[in-house]
Amino acid sequence: MKRAKGVLANLLTVLFTLSAFLLAGFIAVIVPATSNSFYKAQFRKHGTLEKVRAQSAYIDDADAKNYVANMTEEQLLSLMNHTMRYCLYLEDDLNIEKDGKRLEIFLDERGEPLDSGCLEVTHMSDVKKLFGAGVIICIVAAVVFVTTLILGLIFKKEYYLYCRKTVFVTLGACLAVLAVIGVTAAINFDFAFTLFHEIFFSGKQWRFGYGVMINMIGEIFTGIVPIIAAIWIVLLVITVAGAALFNKKISSPKNAPPRP
């Protein structure tokens, strides 16, 4: 019975820690991904507006061609926000409307070889599904986090006796994995970027030879990854600090339960 309690307590603590890790990661992604200040800074840094305007040469829709060719910084920012809303299932169509007209800004043209085409619509549909899966995972993680946190507060004795260090060990393992990914990206970002896309997306439909999408977001990734990593680490440090304070509180002579 005692052994079973220990195993269950450790399992729940591992689930608590993993859910905290995933939630921290989701927050770390969402903060810069929905930040207009971040996008404005990146667009100005990389000269994104002029690069996007130049893609009007590939657009057949006359209204869309004119819109892109004369695009303003605010319109570029609005298009970026629309793309993010699409990925988060807040928009049904990747392309936008202006004055009641649908503008076919994003293309779906298969090239020979495949990566010389522009399968923006197909790829972003896949990205949307990936975001959707991520949101579902985070909702589950939030439920697990709250549930295990409540159980930990209720069953402090079992936590104290069996798994005071489990949070730190589990987070250490998670951080080790994160560190390997981070170091790989720092050494060869193109390799890490390609590997990520080959794991989560089929074929080469994510490789664009031209188009608004790749010119709008292509150079942002090198800027967003360090921000995500920094926010993620800060949130994990807060988690570790919270666990350490909780351990200190329940380990005090006044609160510590007697050992069996």
Question: Where do the PLM segments sit?
Answer:
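Hydrophobic secretory-pathway targeting helix
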Residues: 1-39
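Juxtamembrane interface at the cytosolic side of transmembrane helices
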Residues: 2-15, 141-191, 238-260
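Membrane-helix exit/juxtamembrane interface segments
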Residues: 27-59, 185-195
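Long, solvent-exposed extracytoplasmic domains/loops
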Residues: 39-127
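Short, aromatic-rich amphipathic segments at membrane interfaces
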Residues: 113-134, 211-224
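Hydrophobic, well-structured mid-protein blocks that either form specific transmembrane helices
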Residues: 118-157
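Juxtamembrane non-transmembrane "cap" segments at the membrane-aqueous interface
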Residues: 186-210
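Terminal transmembrane helical module of multi-pass membrane proteins
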Residues: 204-255
